[in-house]
Amino acid sequence: MPIYTSRSCFYLLLFHIILLCSVDKTLCRQTSSFVRSEFPAVDIPIDSKEFAVPKNQFSPQQVHITQGDYDGKAVIVSWVTFIDPGKSEVVYGTSPNSYDHSAQGKTTNYTYYDYTSGYIHHCLLDKLEYDTKYYYKIGKGDAAREFWFHTPPQIHPDASYTFGIIGDLGQTYNSLSTLEHYMKSKGQTVLFVGDLSYADRYSCNNGTRWDSWGRFVERSVAYQPWIWTVGNHEIEYRPDLGEVFPFRAYLNRYPTPHLASASSSPLWYSIRRASAHIIVLSSYSPFVKYTPQWLWLSEELTRVDREKTPWLIVLMHAPLYNSNEAHYMEGESMRVAFESWFVQYKVDLVFAGHVHAYERSYRISNIVYNITSGNRYPIPDKSAPVYITVGDGGNQEGLAERFSESQPDYSAFRESSYGHSTLELRNRTHAFYQWNRNDDGKHIPVDRIIFRNQYWASNTRRRRLKKTRPSQAVERLISSY
């Protein structure tokens, strides 16, 4: 080969490597060098307009919705009233101011130390049509308030859908920035990875901060479902205050459709939405072998049908892989318990929060380790999920700024900034993912990548290989892919 041709090939190859690194960063480990201005974690004052109560004291407030069944044809509408419980009823329909359906709900309340909640209402709207805009009204007369939501497309492997991912939000000015940035995105449903109001950070676990947070996020969650994951700040275990029942506020305020997925607890459950099967786990409930959560997950993974919902996504609070000094190794026990299943069932993505920073891993696993093998480091594994920490919502505890000095080989991108992520499922084979920081005032992604679906990527390859190789050889190749 002529010298000039060899050089041309070399420079062409070099150009493509540089291009790939600059576009999707899948070949380059990166600790972001972005220098932030000072963004102190300052709470929004309780009398701010961001927490404003409705003008009519009888009006519902803190309105929020979540998916109400397994397949996205139901919505749970929740709200709070204070002066009068009123009627726990929602009227709804497909035209504004024309409500031809109604649903009756239930009312509850709770006490925590010296705080007594308002009347908390939960109402199930079921038998909805897919891909339809519904308008709904809560309250009567002058106290009534109206909202809307859009149901997801029918379950289908090529159903396109966009999720937002937010964690550790709180109620600071940084929290507001995250929420405003997200609401300008194309997100249709939020996957919330735990730590909601941070009410436990206030004196005596001030319950009014649950109320202010409910009013704060209403601007989004009254119009699109947020899929809830429990975090450590929802535990609120305070025996010094006489409070020994964990998750009291969370369980009373934020229902989940756990019964639809045969779960025994609202803290772990699963849903199907568009082309995704989403599994929600609790980092702060027992999960070792033979516990209810372990048994449930072992069954739920067998029910996943990748022919219908090719994208398998897991939500939890404490990350299984984390190179930040904050909360280092806190997810290790759950990793040991569940990681082999994640690899076996080819989970696509695992989202977590807890660490107040952002980090994305490569596809790696550490399932071959045992005390005598010496294989103690994570290795590339194309059957493994990508692990993403999005604990950078903006809460009052501030950012986790100290990453390990040397970035581990498994870590693809990390940065200590406030922000949120979006995941656009395009079809059964590809999804567009991006993380957006708040701090630079720009609405452009900082970290982005195109994900190939774990199940369909391997099955497409399997079909191709079967044309030229025997079945056993094909399965060996696929397992190593």
UniProtKB/Swiss-Prot annotation:
Sites carrying sugar chains: 109, 206, 370, 427
Compartment annotation: Vacuole lumen
EC number, as in UniProt: 3.1.3.60
InterPro entries in UniProt: Calcineurin-like_PHP_ApaH, Metallo-depent_PP-like, MPP_PAP, PPA-like, Purple_acid_Pase-like_N, Purple_acid_Pase_N, Purple_acid_PPase_C_dom
Domain of life: Eukaryota
Residue sites binding substrate per the record: 232, 354-356
Activity sensitivity to pH: Optimum pH is 7.
Pfam family, one: Metallophos
Catalytic activity: phosphoenolpyruvate + H2O = pyruvate + phosphate
Positions of Fe cation binding: 168, 195, 198, 356
Residues forming the catalytic site: 327 (proton donor)
Binding site for Zn(2+): 195, 232, 317, 354
A GO CC term attached to the entry: vacuolar lumen
Gene3D superfamilies according to UniProt: 3.60.21.10, Purple acid phosphatase-like, N-terminal (2.60.40.380)
Keywords tagged on the record: Glycoprotein, Hydrolase, Iron, Metal-binding, Protein phosphatase, Signal, Vacuole, Zinc
Keyword field contains Cell wall biogenesis/degradation: no
Enzyme class: hydrolase
Task of the protein: Phosphoenolpyruvate phosphatase that probably operates in the vacuole to release phosphate from phosphoenolpyruvate (PEP) under phosphorus starvation.
Protein family according to the UniProt entry: Belongs to the metallophosphoesterase superfamily. Purple acid phosphatase family.
Protein name per its UniProtKB record: Phosphoenolpyruvate phosphatase
